[in-house]
């Protein structure tokens, strides 16, 4: 049986956006070929999947608390837009829940202003989604809205917020394939260069319900042409391929501009961040970044990186047990590495019983190479390469976010 959707809700979803005025002026963001505002009382877009972003509702009184505006994949337009929408209807559904969502309103071609578009509605009985595909400049774009939909009241609230926010938002979208200018202009030479690194202390709440302090690390790479990358650049310290970063929908890079005694970072998605000069370094977001030296190409490593963690539940929480884990990677000067990781969960040892589940993953290891400021891992058995930044900071050697226990030597 198809999930039920109120008739008024479906009628509203059939693109009232085509004639609805957009929201008031808001901060603009960019993701791939789409330029869009952040609606009032919605959070800035976030996402761990490189192909999508979500803007969570932040409406007063927890109204539609779990509602999200969704920005998904895009592709070259080919064939029927409604068929493309149907083929991608599970893009915003967790992999282990994809069989649970049933279509309540099949993909239907409906124009959105002068653009071809299609709409589909689906639900798993507790959550509902309305998906929209829009063709612009020869490309298909997938957008969506989801929220609670377990009963008539939840459906009504979700539908009302959709009508008030998502539908007007659709009318404000701009598309780079139609000639809309990027929010990130061409860079201007900025005079910065090299790798900068810093750390800060964060307070977090552990599974044992106790507050803990842990260090967070940050790296930012600058190039003289005015480009920066926040994190691990795909090409390391080699000159960045801005076109490839843009095409890959990467949002961790952008332009920097020196202004007076400070600096402004403008990310590819439109976010901005200010940095202030502090001695020889820069302070931003709680981090003080100082310039560090990348390891030279061909550096040989003799040592290891390791970690171990444990968390348990505090007395009085009604729970016992916890989780632990650890890992170690050993590097040899001849270019080999080997590693292992282990993890386990356990319960109620305090009462003398307990159980242990989980196990180890003894990695076969492989070869490593230092190039362009990166430590590149080439695993055995044809697995994909991965890389972390490798550099000297003060008297330590950092491999990604780990301190090396050992030594490095120059290439032979």
Regions found by a protein language model. Give the residues of each.
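N-terminal secretory signal peptides that target proteins for export/translocation
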Residues: 1-5
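Bacterial N-terminal signal peptides
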Residues: 8-20
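Lipid interaction determinants
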Residues: 25-72, 76-412
